[in-house]
Amino acid sequence: MSYEPKVSDFLALTKKEEILPKALTRLKTVSISTKDVISVKESESLCDIDLLVNVPLDKYRYVGVLGVAFTGEWLVPDFVKGGVTVSVIDKRLENSRESMIGTYRAAAKDRRFQFKLVPNYFVSTADAKRKPWQVHVRIQNLKIEAGWQPLALEVVSVAMVTNNVVVKGLREKVIAVNDPNVEGFEGVVDDFVDSVAAFKAIDSFRKKKKKIGGRDVNNNKYRYRPERYAGPDSLQYKEENGLQHHELESVPVFRSDVGRAHSDA
């Protein structure tokens, strides 16, 4: 008996996503692929697998495999000894340990077994069309002549296609602005840039390296109580010792596409 997966088995939908049409939520399209059947005829085999059978890819940039359901059927009597190890692999990754998405083991005496994996990551549709996933099947301690088929595997997946996978980027934050005005967008942009870790690191590094009067600010032992160590010439301003202040130039924000949610995002 085949396992018919449900989207809810792999993905927790919010009330909004359950009620509203897909076009009005970020879950643009969630598809359940038709089955791909693998006939196992060797004690060990590595073969490509299509996890996206009949999943629409042409109109989208990315596809995410939310879950994969495997159903195995032993084609031998249930008193036979032995078992099988099934591993799902992302063949794009060269490191064997890192390329393994998940592994399942089943004994031949169980006759039928089912398991599911949750890869839960996106790939580009260009990569998806090249079938980046493989299944490694290793039958152990099952004494059967070569050329016979002791096991059949059926694979079904739940996938989501979308045109945008950057959920915490500036674009998503701008779209989330309720009041579409220039000031609001500028605030979002400023907050976003200020929160970026690389920007913080550069800003902190620059502050440590600033110098006043040829002396490093951080190494000046008088910087905390300058009034106690002010000399007669301390009020004389020297241009080379002054901190220069530059007024920020305002940059116009064009709203031709900003602030309008794309229908296929």
Curated annotation (Swiss-Prot):
Keyword RNA-binding assigned: yes
Pfam families: MP
Positions of region (Disordered): 216-248
Keyword Transferase: no
Cellular-component GO terms for this entry: host cell cytoplasm; host cell plasmodesma; host cytoskeleton
GO BP terms in the entry: transport of virus in host, cell to cell
GO molecular function: RNA binding
Subcellular location: Host cytoplasm, Host cytoskeleton; Host cell junction, Host plasmodesma
Superkingdom: Viruses
Keyword list, A-Z: Host cell junction, Host cytoplasm, Host cytoskeleton, RNA-binding, Transport, Viral movement protein
Residue stretches of biased makeup (Basic and acidic residues): 224-248
Classification via InterPro entries: TMV_movement, Viral_movement
Similarity field: Belongs to the tobamovirus movement protein family.
Annotated function: Transports viral genome to neighboring plant cells directly through plasmosdesmata, without any budding. The movement protein allows efficient cell to cell propagation, by bypassing the host cell wall barrier. Forms a ribonucleoprotein complex with viral RNA. Binds microtubules and modulates microtubule stability. Can bind double-stranded DNA.
Protein's UniProt name: Movement protein
Gene for this chain: MP
